[in-house]
Amino acid sequence: MKQLLDFLPLIIFFAVYKFFDIYIASGALIAATALQLVVTYALYKKLEKMHLITFAMVTVFGTLTLVFHDDAFIKWKVTIIYALFALALGVSQLLNKSILKSMLGKEMKVADKIWAHVTWYWVSFFAICGLVNIYVAFKLPLETWVNFKVFGLTALTLINTVITVFYLYKHLPEDQRKELK
């Protein structure tokens, strides 16, 4: 259920874009992201920082897109969110307070060096995706960007999540690996 809630705004954005245009889709994205927060809080009685940051960014850049009738704002949102994720992960790692370790370290007991590798891998991933988004958003047709945002970035994120899980699994202590089998 939680994963469906995470993808709900993206699905709504894509569907509305296909039937209408980028401006109505941007408004729908704002509404869907707000709905996501309300439903998430109603079900789980808490909100993750990532959801709040995403909602703030969607609201600001979606509103700017609507007010100025310029799709450049909603296109920049993706790059800025990825840049913020990369920055947060990178700074946390430099301060020896890995966000990823704090999120997953209770379930996966691996060496700090491995958490550092995973963190820098995701910093690189988010930075590259942000840069590729700039190219696709401003050099290719709008429909290509929407498809890239919805399908390309989602698929890349899922693939990188699987790679990360396999990498972490490979470095788990033997007793913990047996528990997962």
From Swiss-Prot:
It is found in: Cell inner membrane. The chain crosses the membrane at residues 10-30, 50-70, 72-92, 118-138, 148-168. It holds the Pfam family IspA. InterPro entries: YciB. Keywords: Cell inner membrane, Cell membrane, Membrane, Transmembrane, Transmembrane helix. It is a multi-pass membrane protein. The keyword Transmembrane applies. GO terms for cellular component: plasma membrane. Plays a role in cell envelope biogenesis, maintenance of cell envelope integrity and membrane homeostasis. Belongs to the YciB family. This is Inner membrane-spanning protein YciB. The lineage of its organism: Bacteria, Pseudomonadati, Pseudomonadota, Gammaproteobacteria, Alteromonadales.
